[in-house]
C-alpha cells in the first residue's frame, strides 16, 4: 500500500519542488527559460562537459526517490548541434543498483551487470534533410542533434528494460541525472501508459480509448494548435521501441503510439535484423540473445513470449509462468509477438513468460502490421511451474566437433551440443548445462584455473559469453564485431581473451578483449582488433605472457603481440614448408627454472602430416617430422609407427604434455608419441576422423573427438578406452521409445539408425544405410525389435537381440512418412509420400501384407514421420488425406473408411483454407482426434461424428511440427519455432501454456515416455526432460488403461500359438489399476452417424457395442448424480431442517442378530452402485490401497502349542484417524498398527497385542472410565460389513462385534456417562448408528446426506452430540420414550466470513456447552449450543485443522501443517454474550510446536499440560507444554519397509524404506536408536557386516545399503556416519549381501547385473551379467564348505525374477569366482494364473548342507529342496499360496513363509507340521530369522513384527 500515493502518476519536478533546489541539486550552466513552443517555463542545461553541467534528482546520490512506477516519462529537447547525456539509476529487487544511460554521444550499445548504455537517435523536422537521411539510412545516425530537433516525450519501460537486458526485477527509481546539452520540462513516473496525442478534454469527448491507454495529464501535455497534428510537431519515443531504422539497442523515434482507432498499443514490437545479411525464415525466428529477430507479417499474433531468466547453474530448462509482479499483468496493454527474449540471469532455472491464453480473438485493423490482442487477466498459470526439467542430452557438436575441454580437476569434460554447453562428469555420466546461447556454439576456451569459460555462438550476430564455471552463471556477454567466431583462446590468468572470425566481407578478423573486470562488474573492453588477409585455423595466447599469441593456418604460422592498443604480428620463416596448411599448435608444457619462460618449443601440425618444432624465443624452425603414409596403418602393419618423408596423414589436432604428445588424424587414429617422436607407444582407432585431442591435467588420460560425433577418453596407464558420448551428425528425423525397456531408437539424415540406453545415454547398437535415408522408426510394443521406413519406400524389421534383419517390405514407392504398430504388436501400418497406406500382419516367424490402398494419404513427405495415428485401443487409424484439407479415419483392423472430415471449412470466419499437418489420438475414450493445421490451430474432433469439439488457436508462430497427449489426456505437447509448449487440456483457454527453449533447430518430434515420467524431444539433438506433473488421481483410480499384454510377462511372447489370443490392449503406463480389468472386445466399433452431440443432450445416447465404453460413460453420469441421490434420500424423510428417524425395538434386535440376518438385511439395504466423490479433507479416513487379499482358510495352531508368540510390533499407523487412546488417570495406553491394537505399558515398554480385525483399523474410542475400548476396521472382503470390536481393557478380551456400516468407520464417540455410543460411517457408507452400551444394541440409525468428519458427545448433556462435515455443523438430540428412541438433528451452516466452501473437520465441547469446530481453511468457530449460532471465529492455522481438544479455558489445535497450538480461550465465555460483535483478539496463543507430520490423533490430561499426539509420519509424541518439550514415544516407517536385518548379538535390527531412510532399532525396547536419511532416493536393501572372528563388537558393526540410484552406502553404527559411497550399478540396487568373511560386497541390480565390490577400497572387482535383463531378488552367502562339490571356496547364490537361480563358488583372496550350478524353474502356461508379484526366493538350507531351498512363481505352489551334489530335487513341500517371503532357521528345521494372502506360515520340516499366523492387513513381503534362531522378524508394508520362536 506504500505506493498508492504514486497513482496515477508522480510529477517528479513538482514532487521535489525543483525551483527551490532543496531536494535536488544543479551544477554548471543550468537556468530556467520560457519556451515559446510549449508556452511554459523549462530548464536549460548546457555546457561542453556533460559531467560538469547537470541537474541531480534527488540532491545526493545516497538518497533515493523511491518511485515505483513502471514507466518513466521524460519531456525534453536536445540542443541543436550538441550532445547530451541522461543517467537513470534504478534499484532491482535484490538491492542491486543499475544505471541506465542514453546519449547521442554513445556510438553503440554497451552492457555490464550494473550499467546499460543506449545510443540515442535524435529526430528531425518532417521533410528536412536530416529526416530524409534518417529514413534512408540504417546505421551511423547517432551523433549531435540536428538543427531541427523537436520536443520529445520519451517513455522508458524501466521494468521491461531491467528484465530484458539484465534479467532483474525492477523495484524503484533511485535517482536521475540530466546532463548537458538539453531543455527539459519535466519527469514523470506512472504505472499507466499515457498517449501524448490525447489530452483529458479530447478523451472526454471521444469517450472511448484503446484498451490500456490513458490520456496525457494536463500538466504534462504538449500544446497543439488547431488544425495541426501532434506528431507533426513533437516526437514520441517508446523504448523498447518498434523502430526499424536502427538495431534493437538504440533509442529513436518510431511509429505513433496508436495506429488505428480502437487498435491496442504494441507493447514490445518486432525488430528486424540488418538487411545486409540474407537469412532464411527459420533463422529469422530463432530465439535471439537480447534480441527479437522477427519481421512483421500481416497476420494476427499471439502474446509476447518473454524469457525471464537463464540459469546460472543450469540444471534444468524450465518455462516459469510467474506473473512477475506486474511484469505481465499490471497496467499492461497488449503485446506484439516478437519471439522469445533470452538473457543472462542469476538463477538456476530458465523461465519464459507464456501466452496469456490458448486462443485469441481476431480483430480487423487498418494497419499493415500485425496487431496483438489483449489477453484476459484471469488466466492461471500451469502447475507445477516449471513442469519440465532438462535432465539429459544425447548429442555432441553441431557447429563444430573441434572443441572439448578438460576441467582443471580432470573429473569433467566440457563440450558444445548445438546451442547448449554440456558439462559431463566422466565417472558418473551426469550432465549439467550452461544455457543462454541462441545459436550453435562455435568455440570454447578455459582460463588456466578453469574458473572462467568463454563461449561463442555462430551466426552473423555472433555473441561471446563469459561464464563463472562453478556457478554456471553468465558474467558478461558482448558482440564480437565479426560475422562468426571460429576460435577462442583465454590467457592463463583469465584477463585476456582472443577471438578469431570473419567480418561481413569474409575477411579474417582478430579481436582481443580485456576480461579482467568481467567477474566484478561484467564489463569487457576491446584491447585491440585487426583485419588480416591470412587464414587462421588456430590461435592461442601464450600461457606465460598474456600479450603474446601464436596463430597458424594455410601457408602461415605467425606470432602476435598486443602493445599500445594495437595488435601486430610477424610470420615465422618456414622455408620450404611455407606452403603447407597448418591445423593446430601447442606450446611445450612445464616450466624449467634454468630457462626463461618464453624459451620453449612450439609444436605446429599440418594437413600434410608434418609436425614442425619451432624455437619460440628465437623464432627459428628447429625440426620437421612427418606421420607415416596412410596406406601403412596399424591394421595392416604391426611394426612400430614412425615418422618418414613420404606422403603423410593429415593431422587435425595436437596436444602436448610434459611427457608425451597426442595427435588426432584424418585416418581416425589417436596416437601418443614420446616428445622425441621416436615411435607410437599407444594408439586408438575411431570410426571417423579425429577432430580434437586434449590431454588431461594429470597427463594420464586423453580426450578425443571425432567428426562422426564420438567423444571418448583414452586411459593411458590401463590402455582402456571409454566412450563418453556418441551423436548423430545430422538432423534427427524420428525416434521411438520401447514400452518396457529403457531404450530409445533414433533415425537421422546421416543415414544411421541408433539405439540408446536412456539410463546411461550409451549407444547400444547402430545400423547404417549407405544409399538411403531412414525416415520413420517405431519399436515393437512387445518384442525387442523395431521397424524402420526409408526414403526408398522400403520398410525393414530388425531384431535387436539377434542384431539381424528379420523382414523387408517393398510395397511403397515413396519415402515412408508414417509407421506404427498396433498396441499388441500383431499389426503394422505404414504410409508413404506418394499416398499409399499398407496393413501388415506381424508374426514371430512370418510377416505378410494384408492390404494396400493407393492414393488415400496426402502426397507430401513433409508430414513424416508422424503422418499416421492409431487410437490407444488399436481400433481407429487416422491420417491426412487424400488431400491436405481432409482427415480420414479408418477401421484399423481392415482399413475400411469410417469417417472423412474436411478441416478447411471448420472455421467459418477464416478467409483462408486450413491444411491439416499432423494428428494424434487422445489416449482415453472417446479417443478424440487432435489435428494440427497450417493456421496454427489444434482441432479436437469427435472420431465418430467428425464434429469439432474444441479448438486451440495461435499454437505457434509457425507450423506445429509435432504434438502428443499424455496418458491421462490432461497435458498436450506441441513443438514448433524451436520451442516446446505444454498445455493443460482440463482447463482450455484459462491456463497459460509453459514454453521451453533449448533446441537450435526445428523440433522434429516430441512425445511422452511410456511411463509418463519423461518427455523426449528431438531435432538437433535428443533432449530428455523430467516431466514433473503429478499423476492424475482420477486417472490412476479409474480403469482407463487396460491390462498389460500377456506376452510382456512371460515366455508367451515367444510362443506363436499365443498370437490368436492377443488383442489391441494398450500397454500399461506403470500406474496401479484401480479396478478389475474388463474383457477387451475385438469387434470394430459401429460408427455413430447421429448429428446430435451427447454432451449437449445428456438424455440422448448413441448406440455402441463396446461394453467397456458404455459402462465408462455410465460411470461418469452416475458419479455426477450421486450427491443429488443422497439429497433425495434425506429429503424424503422430512421436508424440513429437523429430521426424525424412528427405530422399533424388533428392528434393533434384527440388526444385532446372527450373521445370516445381517446378510439378509444387507441385501435389502438401499445402496448406490457407485461411490460418491471423495472428500477433499485429510481428516477423512481413506484406507490404504492394497493388492493383497485375505486367505480363505488357515491352519490354526492348537492352543498352547504355538511355535510363535508375538513379542513386539514396531510402528504406528499414521494413516488412521483418532487411532490412539490414553487415559492419564489409569495409565491405559493403546494405539493401532495395521489390524493390530497395541496396548503398551508406558513405564516398562512391554506390549500386549489384541488381534482379530481382518483389515486396517481406522479409529478407536475409549470410555471415560477406561474400561472399554472400541475399535473399527473394514471387513476384509466385499461381502460382509465392517467390524466394530468392543474390548475389555482389563483382560484384553473381545466382548462384542458390531456390524452395521458397509465400508469404513470414520469416527466413534462415547457419551459422558458411557451409556451411549455413536459411530459414523465414511463418505461411501453415509450412515450414523446410535448404540446402547448395555448389550450394545442398535437404538437408531440415520442416513447422512453429506460426509461427516467428526462426532462427539456433549459432556454437559448426555443426550446431545454434534457432528461436523462440509459447510455445516449438525446438533443431534436423543429422545427416548419407553423402548422407542428418536434422534433429531438441527443443521447450521458455517458463517459467511468463513466461506461456503469451508469444511468443518473437527469439533470439541467445553464444559459449558460451547462447541468449538475446526475448519479446512484453518479457522476455528465457536458455537452456542443453546441458540445454535456461531458467535466467534478466528484464524488458528494456515492449514486444515484435524484435531481439537478443549479442557477448561484451554484449547488445543492440530493441523496438516504439522503444528499443534495451545490457545487461551478464557474470554470466550464473556464474548458469548456479545454475539456477532465479538473480537477474535481476545483469544491468545500460548504455545506452539511443529512435529514431523499432519496431526491425526491427540489425547491430553484434564489441564491440557501433557499428552500424546500422533502424526501421519507414523510417530507418537509425548508433549509437555509446561516444559515445552516433545519426546518421541513410538516410531515407525511411513512408507513401505523394503528390507530388514538382525545384527549379531540380536540386540539391534535395521530396516530401510521407500523414503530413503535406514533405521536402527533396539530389539529390547523397540525404540528408534539411529536413522540415516538419503533424500530423493529409496533404500531398497541392506546387510549387516558379518561378525568378526574376534567376537561380537559393536564398534566394528557396519551396514551396507543399496539405493534406487544404483549406489551403495556403507554406514558405521558406532560412529553414526556414512563411511563410503560406491556406485557400481547404473540402476537400482535390489539385493545386497556381505561375503561370510566380510571382504567383499555382493550386490544385484534391477537390470540383472551383479557387482562384486570391496567395502574397504570401494573398487568394483567384478561384474557378472549372467542374470542380465531380470532384476535380482536374492543374494545369499554361506560359509559352510562341502566335500562333495568339485570346487572349494565360499558358496553363494543369486536369484532373479525370471525364476532362475545361480550358485557360485568363490575364493575372494585368489580373485576366483566360478559358476557352480544354474537352476531354471518353469512358469504356468495359462494366462489366468499369471502373477507378476510373486518373487523368486532361494536360500541355503542350514540343516542340510549342499541343499538350496527354492520357491517362486511356478506350476505348483510349493517349496523345493534341491541338492547341489545329487543335482536333483530332494523334497517338495506344498503351499496353499505362493510365497512372497522365505527364511530358514539356523537352529531348527523351521521355515517361515509369508504370502500375499496376509498369512505367515511356520513349517517344521522334521515333524511335517505347519501353523498359520494372521496379524497382518497386507501381504507379508519380508521374513528374517535372527542368527541364533530365537527371533523371527516379518514386515507387512510399513509394519515390523517381532516374534519369539519356541524352538522346543
Swiss-Prot record:
Q: What are the recorded Gene Ontology BP terms?
A: centriole elongation; cilium assembly
Q: Where are the WD repeats?
A: 436-479, 481-523, 530-570, 644-683, 685-724, 727-766, 769-808, 811-850, 955-993, 998-1035, 1252-1297, 1300-1341, 1343-1382, 1395-1433, 1435-1473, 1532-1571, 1574-1621, 1624-1663, 1670-1714, 1774-1813, 1815-1848
Q: Which SUPFAM superfamilies match?
A: Quinoprotein alcohol dehydrogenase-like, WD40 repeat-like
Q: Where is the composition biased (Basic and acidic residues)?
A: 320-335, 1114-1129, 1164-1178
Kindly report the protein's main subcellular placement as a broad class: cytoplasm
Question: What InterPro entries would the database entry show?
Answer: Beta-prop_EML_1st, Beta-prop_WDR90_POC16_2nd, CFA20_dom, Quinoprotein_ADH-like_sf, WD40/YVTN_repeat-like_dom_sf, WD40_repeat_dom_sf, WD40_rpt, WD_repeat_EMAP
Q: Where in the cell is it found?
A: Cytoplasm, Cytoskeleton, Microtubule organizing center, Centrosome, Centriole; Cytoplasm, Cytoskeleton, Microtubule organizing center, Centrosome, Centriolar satellite
Q: Where is the composition biased (Acidic residues)?
A: 1102-1113
In alphabetical order, the GO MF annotations are:
microtubule binding
Pfam families reported in the protein's UniProt record: Beta-prop_EML, Beta-prop_WDR90_POC16_2nd, CFA20_dom, WD40, WDR90_beta-prop_4th
* Start and end residues of each stretch annotated as Disordered: 257-278, 316-336, 1053-1133, 1151-1178
In the UniProt record, which is one GO cellular component term?
Answer: centriole
Q: Where is this region: Binds with microtubules?
A: 1-222
Family, according to the entry, reads as follows: Belongs to the WD repeat WDR90/POC16 family.
What does the function comment of this entry state? Microtubule-binding protein that plays a crucial role in ensuring inner core protein localization within the centriole core, as well as in maintaining the microtubule wall integrity and the overall centriole roundness and stability. Required for efficient primary cilium formation.
What is the recorded name of this protein? Answer: WD repeat-containing protein 90
Which organism is the protein's source?
Xenopus tropicalis (Western clawed frog)
Amino acid at each position: 500500500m506504500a505506493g498508492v500515493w504514486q497513482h496515477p502518476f508522480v510529477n517528479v519536478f513538482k514532487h521535489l519542488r525543483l525551483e527551490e533546489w532543496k531536494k535536488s541539486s544543479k551544477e554548471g550552466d543550468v537556468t530556467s527559460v520560457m519556451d515559446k513552443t510549449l508556452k511554459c517555463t523549462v530548464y536549460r542545461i548546457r555546457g561542453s562537459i556533460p559531467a560538469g553541467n547537470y541537474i541531480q534528482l534527488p540532491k545526493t546520490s545516497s538518497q533515493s526517490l523511491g518511485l515505483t512506477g513502471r514507466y518513466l516519462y521524460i519531456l525534453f529537447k536536445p540542443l541543436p548541434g550538441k550532445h547530451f547525456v541522461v543517467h537513470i539509476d534504478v534499484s532491482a529487487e535484490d538491492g542491486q543498483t543499475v544505471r541506465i544511460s542514453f546519449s547521442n554521444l554513445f556510438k553503440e550499445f554497451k552492457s555490464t551487470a550494473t550499467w546499460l548504455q543506449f545510443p540515442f537517435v535524435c529526430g528531425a523536422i518532417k521533410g528536412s534533410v536530416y529526416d530524409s537521411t534518417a529514413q534512408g539510412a540504417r546505421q551511423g545516425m547517432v551523433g549531435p542533434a540536428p538543427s531541427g530537433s523537436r520536443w520529445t516525450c520519451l517513455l522508458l519501460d524501466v521494468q521491461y528494460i531491467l528484465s530484458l537486458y539484465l534479467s532483474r526485477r525492477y523495484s524503484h527509481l533511485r535517482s536521475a541525472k540530466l546532463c548537458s546539452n538539453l531543455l527539459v520540462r519535466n519527469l514523470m513516473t506512472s504505472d499507466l501508459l499515457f498517449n501524448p496525442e490525447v489530452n483529458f478534454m479530447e478523451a472526454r469527448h471521444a469517450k472511448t480509448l484503446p484498451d490500456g491507454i490513458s490520456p496525457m495529464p494536463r500538466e504534462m501535455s504538449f500544446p497543439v494548435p488547431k488544425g495541426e497534428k501532434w506528431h507533426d510537431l513533437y516526437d514520441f519515443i517508446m523504448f523498447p521501441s518498434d523502430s526499424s531504422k536502427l538495431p534493437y539497442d538504440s533509442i529513436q523515434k518510431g511509429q505513433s503510439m496508436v495506429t488505428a482507432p480502437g487498435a491496442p498499443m504494441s507493447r514490445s514490437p518486432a525488430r528486424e535484423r540488418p538487411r545486409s545479411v540474407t537469412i532464411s525464415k527459420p533463422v529469422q525466428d530463432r530465439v535471439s540473445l537480447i534480441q527479437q529477430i522477427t519481421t512483421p507479417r500481416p497476420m494476427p499474433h499471439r502474446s509476447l513470449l518473454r524469457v525471464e531468466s537463464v540459469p546460472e547453474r543450469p540444471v534444468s530448462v524450465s518455462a516459469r509462468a510467474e506473473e512477475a509482479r506486474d511484469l505481465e499483468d499490471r497496467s499492461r496493454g497488449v503485446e506484439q509477438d516478437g519471439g522469445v527474449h533470452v538473457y543472462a540471469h542469476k538463477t538456476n532455472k530458465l523461465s519464459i513468460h507464456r501466452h496469456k491464453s490458448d486462443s485469441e480473438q481476431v480483430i480487423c485493423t487498418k494497419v499493415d502490421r500485425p496487431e496483438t490482442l489483449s489477453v484476459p487477466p484471469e488466466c492461471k498459470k500451469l502447475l507445477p511451474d516449471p513442469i519440465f526439467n532438462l535432465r539429459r542430452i544425447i548429442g555432441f557438436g553441431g557447429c563444430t566437433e573441434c572443441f572439448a575441454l578438460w576441467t582443471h580437476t580432470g573429473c569433467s569434460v566440457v563440450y558444445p551440443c548445438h546451442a547448449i554447453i554440456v558439462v559431463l562428469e566422466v565417472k558418473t555420466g551426469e550432465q549439467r548445462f550452461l544455457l543462454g546461447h541462441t545459436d550453435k556454439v562455435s568455440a570454447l576456451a578455459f582460463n588456466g584455473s578453469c574458473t572462467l569459460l568463454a563461449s561463442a555462438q555462430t551466426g552473423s550476430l555472433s555473441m561471446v559469453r563469459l561464464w563463472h564455471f562453478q556457478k554456471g552463471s553468465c558474467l558478461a556477454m558482448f558482440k564480437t564485431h565479426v560475422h562468426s567466431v571460429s576460435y577462442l583462446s583465454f590467457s592463463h590468468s583469465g584477463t585476456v581473451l582472443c577471438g578469431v572470425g570473419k567480418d561481413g566481407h569474409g575477411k579474417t578478423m582478430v579481436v582481443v578483449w580485456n576480461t579482467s573486470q568481467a567477474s566484478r562488474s561484467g564489463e569487457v573492453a576491446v584491447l585491440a582488433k585487426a583485419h588480416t588477409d591470412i587464414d587462421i585455423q588456430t590461435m592461442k595466447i601464450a600461457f606465460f605472457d598474456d600479450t603474446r599469441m601464436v596463430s597458424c593456418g594455410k601457408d602461415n604460422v605467425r606470432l602476435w603481440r598486443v602493445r599500445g592498443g594495437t595488435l601486430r604480428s610477424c610470420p615465422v620463416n618456414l622455408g620450404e614448408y611455407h606452403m603447407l596448411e597448418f591445423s593446430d599448435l601447442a606450446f611445450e608444457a612445464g616450466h624449467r627454472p634454468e630457462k626463461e619462460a618464453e624459451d620453449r618449443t612450439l609444436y605446429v601440425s599440418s594437413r600434410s602430416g608434418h609436425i614442425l618444432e619451432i624455437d619460440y624465443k628465437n623464432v627459428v624452425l628447429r625440426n620437421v617430422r612427418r606421420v607415416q603414409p596412410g596406406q601403412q596403418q596399424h591394421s595392416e602393419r604391426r611394426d612400430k609407427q614412425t615418422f618418414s618423408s613420404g606422403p603423410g596423414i593429415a593431422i587435425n589436432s595436437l596436444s602436448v604434455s610434459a611427457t608425451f604428445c597426442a595427435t588426432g588424424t584424418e585416418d581416425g587414429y589417436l596416437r601418443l608419441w614420446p616428445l622425441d617422436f621416436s615411435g607410437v607407444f599407444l594408439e586408438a582407432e575411431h570410426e571417423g576422423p579425429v577432430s580434437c585431442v586434449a590431454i588431461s591435467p594429470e597427463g594420464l588420460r586423453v580426450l578425443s573427438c571425432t567428426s562422426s560425433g564420438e567423444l571418448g577418453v583414452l586411459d593411458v596407464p590401463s590402455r582402456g578406452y571409454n566412450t563418453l558420448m556418441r551423436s548423430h551428425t545430422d538432423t534427427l528425423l524420428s525416434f521411438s521409445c520401447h514400452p518396457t525397456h529403457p531404450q530409445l531408437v533414433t533415425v537421422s539424415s546421416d543415414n544411421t539408425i541408433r539405439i540408446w540406453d536412456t539410463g546411461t545415454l550409451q549407444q547400444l547398437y547402430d545400423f547404417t544405410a549407405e544409399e538411403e535415408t531412414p525416415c520413420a522408426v517405431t519399436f515393437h510394443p512387445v518384442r525387442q525389435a523395431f521397424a524402420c521406413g526409408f526414403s526408398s519406400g522400403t520398410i525393414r524389421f530388425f531384431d535387436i537381440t539377434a542384431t539381424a534383419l528379420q523382414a523387408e517390405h517393398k510395397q511403397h514407392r515413396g519415402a515412408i512418412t508414417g509407421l506404427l504398430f498396433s498396441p499388441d504388436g500383431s499389426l503394422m501400418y505404414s504410409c508413404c509420400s506418394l499416398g499409399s497406406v499398407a496393413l501388415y500382419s506381424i508374426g514371430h516367424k512370418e510377416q505378410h501384407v494384408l492390404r494396400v490402398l493407393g492414393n488415400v494419404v496426402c502426397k507430401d513427405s513433409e508430414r513424416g514421420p508422424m503422418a499416421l495415428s492409431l487410437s490407444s485401443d488399436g481400433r481407429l487409424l487416422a491420417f491426412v488425406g487424400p488431400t491436405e484439407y481432409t482427415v480420414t479415419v479408418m477401421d484399423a483392423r481392415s482399413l475400411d473408411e469410417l469417417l472423412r472430415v474436411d478441416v478447411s471449412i471448420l472455421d467459418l470466419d477464416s478467409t483462408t483454407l486450413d491444411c491439416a499437418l499432423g494428428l494424434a489420438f487422445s489416449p482415453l475414450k472417446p479417443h478424440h482426434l487432435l489435428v494440427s493445421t497450417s493456421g496454427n490451430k489444434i482441432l479436437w474432433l469427435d472420431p465418430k461424428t467428425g464434429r469439432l469439439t474444441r479448438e486451440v488457436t495461435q499454437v505457434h508462430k509457425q507450423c506445429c511440427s509435432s504434438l502428443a497427449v499424455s496418458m491421462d489426456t490432461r497435458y498436450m505437447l506441441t513443438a514448433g519455432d524451436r520451442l516446446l509448449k505444454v498445455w493443460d487440456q482440463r482447463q482450455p483457454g484459462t491456463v497459460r501454456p509453459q514454453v521451453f527453449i533449448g533446441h537450435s533447430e526445428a523440433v522434429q518430434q516430441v512425445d511422452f515416455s511410456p511411463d509418463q515420467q519423461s518427455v523426449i524431444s528431438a531435432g538437433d539433438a535428443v533432449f530428455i526432460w523430467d516431466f514433473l506433473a503429478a499423476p492424475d488421481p482420477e486417472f490412476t483410480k479409474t480403469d482407463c488403461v487396460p491390462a498389460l499384454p500377456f506376452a510382456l510377462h512371460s515366455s508367451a511372447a515367444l510362443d506363436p500359438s499365443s498370437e490368436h489370443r492377443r488383442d489391441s490392449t494398450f500397454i500399461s503406463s506403470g500406474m496401479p489399476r484401480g479396478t478389475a480389468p474388463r474383457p477387451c472386445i475385438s469387434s470394430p466399433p459401429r460408427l455413430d452417424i447421429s448429428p446430435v452431440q451427447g454432451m449437449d443432450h445428456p438424455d440422448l445416447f448413441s448406440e455402441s457395442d463396446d461394453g467397456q465404453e458404455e459402462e465408462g460413460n455410465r460411470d461418469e453420469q452416475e458419479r455426477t448424480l450421486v450427491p443429488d441421490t443422497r439429497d433425495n434420500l434425506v429429503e424424503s424423510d422430512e421436508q424440513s431442517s429437523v429430521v426424525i428417524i424412528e427405530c422399533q425395538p424388533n428392528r434393533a434386535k434384527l440388526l444385532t442378530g446372527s450373521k445370516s440376518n445381517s446378510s439378509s438385511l444387507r441385501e435389502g439395504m438401499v445402496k448406490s452402485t457407485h461411490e460418491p466423490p471423495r472428500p477433499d479433507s485429510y481428516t477423512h479416513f481413506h484406507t490404504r490401497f492394497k493388492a493383497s487379499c485375505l486367505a480363505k482358510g488357515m491352519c490354526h495352531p492348537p492352543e498352547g502349542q504355538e511355535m510363535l508368540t508375538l513379542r513386539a510390533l514396531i510402528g504406528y499407523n499414521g494413516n488412521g484417524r483418532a487411532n490412539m487412546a490414553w487415559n492419564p488417570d489409569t495409565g491405559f495406553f493403546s494405539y493401532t498398527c495395521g489390524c493390530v491394537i497395541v496396548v503398551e505399558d508406558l513405564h516398562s515398554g512391554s506390549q500386549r497385542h489384541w488381534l482379530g480385525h481382518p483389515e486396517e483399523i481406522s479409529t478407536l474410542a475409549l470410555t471415560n472410565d477406561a474400561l472399554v475400548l472400541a475399535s473399527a476396521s473394514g471387513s476384509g472382503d466385499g461381502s460382509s460389513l465392517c467390524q466394530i470390536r468392543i474390548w475389555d481393557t482389563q483382560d484384553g478380551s473381545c466382548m462384542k462385534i458390531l456390524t452395521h456400516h458397509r465400508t469404513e468407520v470414520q469416527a466413534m464417540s462415547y457419551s459422558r456417562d458411557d451409556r451411549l455410543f455413536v459411530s459414523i460411517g465414511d463418505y461411501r457408507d453415509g450412515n450414523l448408528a446410535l448404540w446402547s452400551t448395555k448389550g450394545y444394541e442398535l437404538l437408531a440409525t440415520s442416513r447422512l446426506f453429506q460426509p461427516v468428519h467428526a462426532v462427539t458427545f456433549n459432556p454437559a448433556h448426555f443426550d446431545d452430540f454434534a457432528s461436523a462435515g462440509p459447510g455445516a455443523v449438525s446438533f443431534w438430540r436423543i429422545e427416548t420414550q419407553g423402548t422407542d428412541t428418536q434422534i433429531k438433528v438441527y443443521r447450521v451452516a458455517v458463517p459467511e466470513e468463513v466461506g461456503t466452501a469451508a469444511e468443518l473437520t473437527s469439533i470439541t465441547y467445553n464444559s459449558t456447552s460451547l462447541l468449538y469446530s475446526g475448519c479446512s481453511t484453518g479457522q476455528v468457530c465457536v458455537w452456542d449450543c443453546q441458540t445454535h449460532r456461531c458467535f466467534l471465529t478466528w484464524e488458528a492455522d494456515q492449514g486444515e485443522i484435524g484435531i481439537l481438544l478443549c479442557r477448561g479455558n484451554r484449547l488445543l489445535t492440530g493441523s496438516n501443517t504439522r503444528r499443534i497450538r495451545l490457545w487461551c480461550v478464557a474470554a470466550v465465555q464473556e464474548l458469548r454474550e456479545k454475539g456477532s460483535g465479538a473480537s477474535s483478539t481476545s483469544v491468545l496463543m500460548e504455545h506452539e510446536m511443529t512435529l514431523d507430520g499432519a496431526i491425526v490423533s491427540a489425547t491430553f490430561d484434564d489441564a491440557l499440560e501433557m499428552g500424546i499426539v500422533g502424526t501421519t509420519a507414523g510417530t507418537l509424541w509425548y508433549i509437555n507444554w509446561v516444559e515445552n518439550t516433545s519426546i518421541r514415544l513410538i516410531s515407525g516407517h511411513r512408507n513401505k519397509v523394503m528390507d530388514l536385518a538382525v545384527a549379531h548379538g540380536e540386540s539391534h535390527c535395521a530396516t530401510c524404506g521407500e523414503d530413503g531412510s535406514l533405521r536402527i532399532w533396539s530389539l529390547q525396547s523397540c525404540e528408534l536408536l539411529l536413522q540415516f536419511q538419503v533424500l530423493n532416493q529409496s533404500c531398497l536393501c541392506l546387510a549387516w557386516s558379518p561378525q568378526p572372528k574376534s567376537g561380537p563388537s559393536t564398534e566394528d558393526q557396519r551396514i551396507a545399503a543399496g539405493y534406487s540410484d544404483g549406489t551403495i552406502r556403507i554406514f558405521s553404527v558406532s560412529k553414526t556416519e556414512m563411511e563410503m559411497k560406491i556406485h557400481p550399478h547404473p540402476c537400482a540396487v535390489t539385493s545386497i549381501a556381505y561375503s561370510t568373511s566380510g571382504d567383499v560386497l555382493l550386490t544385484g541390480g534391477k537390470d540383472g547385473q551383479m557387482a562384486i565390490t570391496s567395502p574397504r577400497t570401494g573398487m568394483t572387482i567384478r561384474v557378472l551379467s549372467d542374470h542380465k535383463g531380470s532384476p535380482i531378488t536374492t543374494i545369499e552367502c554361506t560359509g559352510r564348505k562341502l566335500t562333495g562339490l568339485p570346487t572349494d571356496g565360499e558358496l553363494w547364490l543369486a536369484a532373479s525374477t525370471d525364476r532362475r537361480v545361480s550358485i557360485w563358488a568363490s575364493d575372494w583372496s585368489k580373485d576366483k569366482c566360478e559358476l557352480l550350478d544354474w537352476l531354471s524353474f518353469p512358469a504356468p502356461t495359462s494366462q489366468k494364473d499369471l502373477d507378476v508379484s510373486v518373487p523368486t526366493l532361494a536360500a541355503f538350507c542350514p540343516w542340510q548342507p549342499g541343499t538350496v531351498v527354492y520357491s517362486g512363481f511356478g506350476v505348483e505352489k510349493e517349496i523345493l529342496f534341491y541338492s547341489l551334489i545329487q543335482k536333483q530335487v530332494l523334497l517338495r513341500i506344498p503351499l496353499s499360496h505362493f510365497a512372497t517371503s522365505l527364511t530358514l532357521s539356523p537352529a531348527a528345521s523351521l521355515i517361515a513363509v509369508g504370502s500375499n494372502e496376509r498369512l505367515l506360515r511356520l513349517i517344521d520340516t522334521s515333524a511335517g507340521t505347519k501353523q498359520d499366523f494372521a496379524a497382518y492387513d497386507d501381504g507379508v513381503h519380508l521374513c528374517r530369522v535372527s542368527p541364533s534362531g530365537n527371533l523371527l522378524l516379518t514386515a507387512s508394508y510399513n509394519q515390523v513384527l517381532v516374534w519369539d520362536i519356541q524352538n522346543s
